[in-house]
């Protein structure tokens, strides 16, 4: 079975830097596990590796789509699987640098995501129409009736996950939660998780947002805002929608920046919760342990020799 190394953790913890360092030392190539880094129009807000970093180590699933393309978790899994096969054929180590927990999980494990795109999109359209007419609470109520265990793990505002669960239920006729329990691994994988003191992570997140503003975050957000009438996933991405009130003249720029920092901190907390509850992660602290990377490499070498 193909071995795959995954690097996960909250935003701003240093996943990209570690993935690049490990790729150089372990003869690896990187597959982005972030659902937003595929879009070539958005650079700053998605915190992609720089062009220089991408030149040093080959990256897959970065800048491969337009924000106006349809792109599902199934598309991600199909493309990432192809990338991992390519890397494996070169006798290199595939390194998944991931931020989006469900995408990472769906790739590493055989989750039911639909066999044909037509079926998947058709069923989803039904629930998207229902959401527009009735709102997230009533959508979630339906999931709660059909599958209370699945609903318990999905917050009411997360309509996309609610629709995904309902889509799987419609397509298979089985509870989403039951299918989640029967997951089989797709690869022989090792997951390295980065985490540290919460306040330090929050401080780094605040600094990252400030740097993003200096690099042109507002221009990217304006592009997304100007195209808000078109259906695309980036509309819901943290880093863009927080600035819509500024463009509407409802809030000051500083208020929106603070709102983005708050949203990013909450997202980091949700990331940690998902990885802790859904995946077998080996945790390390890169901010307080000077020997962190050496320990990680020892962990990886032991796994590679199994």
Swiss-Prot record:
Its cofactor is Mg(2+). Keywords: ATP-binding, Magnesium, Nucleotide-binding, Transferase, tRNA processing. It catalyses: adenosine(37) in tRNA + dimethylallyl diphosphate = N(6)-dimethylallyladenosine(37) in tRNA + diphosphate. GO terms for molecular function: ATP binding; tRNA dimethylallyltransferase activity. GO terms for biological process: tRNA modification. Pfam families: IPPT. It comes from the Bacteria. PANTHER family: TRNA DIMETHYLALLYLTRANSFERASE. Catalyzes the transfer of a dimethylallyl group onto the adenine at position 37 in tRNAs that read codons beginning with uridine, leading to the formation of N6-(dimethylallyl)adenosine (i(6)A). This is tRNA dimethylallyltransferase.
